[in-house]
């Protein structure tokens, strides 16, 4: 890349930095005063004219300054050489906060809350997809002789508890037999296979246990099926309202805050964006129209996968206006995802 291209990128970088910081369109005079670009005001004006002609910056109707376009942000993100890492103290605080989680739900909710605080954006995490999980253990506990508690634990740390009302009472020997039948059908199987196995169990069960097996199997099949409405945790939605001007049109962004909030309510939209994240070691940045979601044309989504023992369990990330601190947000998303995976792997 030529020295002229490098210089123009430095001008673009300065425009992005100032606009993200001030939310005000940036003029050439301000750039020269705030940044050590090493060139004259005339050169900066010429470079800004070139950047505008190439679609990297644009002029809002209400100002003489310029703001980055989606194309400009993309160029900036693609050329970020160094993402500022979090400090040792920040990393330690993240890990300690996540390690205090009592179970999978608590760890994920802590992760979302933390990510929203670090980035000042909307944070989102996808629960581990059941298709990637296996049954680690099924515990069957008699609450009364005619009522059972089933506790299903997956290898991703998910714990589901369900009550089964029996038609007949079970003594300790029958309970042990039922526990053996259910556990033998489920333990170690992927959840899709486990659902099939437990459905077929009624045909193989001894006559005296068949009713208890059918009732238990019915509850377990419901537990093993994906429930999309339960698969997403959001945090920091209020951060969107703090950035409401970014969605009002006065800053040059299409779309509206209401449209973004409606998209968040339709969790399937966000799930599709996170589902495209398959690598726990790579952070993906989608800017504006790259989200391919009409209501979210004025937003950016920064996401990655999280997992344990080499398996990606789900996706997580942040969503906010295209005017965001990309280097800091990328670092925060990567760190929180990495430490969630580390905490889950140790459980």
UniProtKB/Swiss-Prot annotation:
A Pfam family hit: HrcA
GO BP terms, alphabetized: negative regulation of DNA-templated transcription
Single Gene Ontology MF annotation: DNA binding
Keywords on record: Repressor, Stress response, Transcription, Transcription regulation
Highest taxon listed in the record's lineage: Bacteria
HAMAP family: HrcA (MF_00081)
Family: Belongs to the HrcA family.
Role noted for this protein: Negative regulator of class I heat shock genes (grpE-dnaK-dnaJ and groELS operons). Prevents heat-shock induction of these operons.
Identification of the protein by name: Heat-inducible transcription repressor HrcA
């Amino acid at each position: 890349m030529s020295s002229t291209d490098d210089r123009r990128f430095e001008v673009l970088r300065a425009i992005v930095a100032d606009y993200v910081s001030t939310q005000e369109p940036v003029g050439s005079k301000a750039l020269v005063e705030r940044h050590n670009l090493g060139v004259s005001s005339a050169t900066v004006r010429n470079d800004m004219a070139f950047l505008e002609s190439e679609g990297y910056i644009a002029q809002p109707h209400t100002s003489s300054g310029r703001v980055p376009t989606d194309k400009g942000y993309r160029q900036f993100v693609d050329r970020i050489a160094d993402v500022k890492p979090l400090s040792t103290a920040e990393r330690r605080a993240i890990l300690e906060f996540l390690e205090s989680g009592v179970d999978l739900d608590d760890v994920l909710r802590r992760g979302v809350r933390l990510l929203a605080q670090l980035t000042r954006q909307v944070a989102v995490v996808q629960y581990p997809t059941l298709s990637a999980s296996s049954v680690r253990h099924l515990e069957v506990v008699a609450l009364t002789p005619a009522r059972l508690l089933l506790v299903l634990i997956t290898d991703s740390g998910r714990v589901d508890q369900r009550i089964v009302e029996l038609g007949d009472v079970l003594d300790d020997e029958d309970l042990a037999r039922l526990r053996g039948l259910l556990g033998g059908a489920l333990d170690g199987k992927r959840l899709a296979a486990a659902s099939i196995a437990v459905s077929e169990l009624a045909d193989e069960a001894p006559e005296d246990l068949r009713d208890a097996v059918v009732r238990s199997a019915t509850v377990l099949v419901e537990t093993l099926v994906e429930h999309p409405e339960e698969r997403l945790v959001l945090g920091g939605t209020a951060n969107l309202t703090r950035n409401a001007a970014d969605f009002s049109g006065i800053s040059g962004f299409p779309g509206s805050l209401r449209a973004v909030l409606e998209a968040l309510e339709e969790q399937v939209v966000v799930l599709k964006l996170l589902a495209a994240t398959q690598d726990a070691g790579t952070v993906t940045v989608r800017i504006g129209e790259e989200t391919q979601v009409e209501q979210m044309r004025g937003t950016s989504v920064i996401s990655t996968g999280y997992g344990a023992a080499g398996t990606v369990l789900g996706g997580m990330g942040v969503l906010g206006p295209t005017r965001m601190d990309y280097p800091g947000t990328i670092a925060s998303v990567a760190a929180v995802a990495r430490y969630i995976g580390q905490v889950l792997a140790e459980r």
